[in-house]
Amino acid sequence: MTTTYFGPWLIRQSEIFFTTELSFALVNLKPVLPGHVLVCPKRIVPRVKDLTKEEFTDLWLSAQRISSVVEEHFNGDGITFAIQDGKNAGQTVEHVHIHIIPRKKFDFENNDQIYNEIEKEREPRSYEEMEKESSELRPLFEENKNKTF
């Protein structure tokens, strides 16, 4: 069985819905909006500048594919991609990760309010909720594995 970490935390395989050789995506413990997921390199590196070219490319190609699927699945009409790269940028987990958040018109009064929400402390959801979402997302990537994004 594969062991996956997000920073210092062991991630249950049931929370992961997408993997490549170099990246993985997981559902978010404390989502800002429905469909808020994270994509990370498998290698734990603290900053974007620490990624290899291959990891950087794979991470963003994965983000592109994941965003397309979650936007459609959660009936969004836009995506917010967010990276907090370094402590002074708001990074709280020293493992590069991209927040992928499906958006809808008027989901916030001010569009940029989402960045404040990412920074706020939020209530964690249950592992059962996370596993349910992950199990809904996982087959969508099988269905779309040959689709060009």
Curated annotation (Swiss-Prot):
Residues 1-115 form the HIT domain. It is an enzyme of class 3 (hydrolase). It is found in: Cytoplasm. Its EC number is 3.6.1.29. Its cofactor is Mg(2+); Mn(2+). One of its GO terms (molecular function) is nucleotide binding. It catalyses: P(1),P(3)-bis(5'-adenosyl) triphosphate + H2O = AMP + ADP + 2 H(+). A motif (Histidine triad motif) lies at residues 95-99. Divalent metal cations. Mg(2+) or Mn(2+). Its main location: cytoplasm. GO terms for cellular component: cytoplasm. InterPro entries: Bis(5'-adenosyl)-TPase_reg, FHIT, Histidine_triad_CS, Histidine_triad_HIT, HIT-like, HIT-like_sf. Substrate binds at N28, Q84, G90, Q91, T92, V93, H99. The active site is at H97 (tele-amp-histidine intermediate). Keywords: Apoptosis, Cytoplasm, Hydrolase, Nucleotide-binding, Transcription, Transcription regulation. Residues 120-149 are annotated as: Disordered. PANTHER family: BIS(5'-ADENOSYL)-TRIPHOSPHATASE (PTHR46243:SF1). Cleaves P(1)-P(3)-bis(5'-adenosyl) triphosphate (Ap3A) to yield AMP and ADP. Can also hydrolyze P(1)-P(4)-bis(5'-adenosyl) tetraphosphate (Ap4A), but has extremely low activity with ATP. Modulates transcriptional activation by CTNNB1 and thereby contributes to regulate the expression of genes essential for cell proliferation and survival. Plays a role in the induction of apoptosis via p53/TP53, SRC and AKT1 signaling pathways. Induction of apoptosis depends on the ability of FHIT to bind P(1)-P(3)-bis(5'-adenosyl) triphosphate or related compounds, but does not require its catalytic activity. Homodimer. This is Bis(5'-adenosyl)-triphosphatase. It comes from Dictyostelium discoideum (Social amoeba).
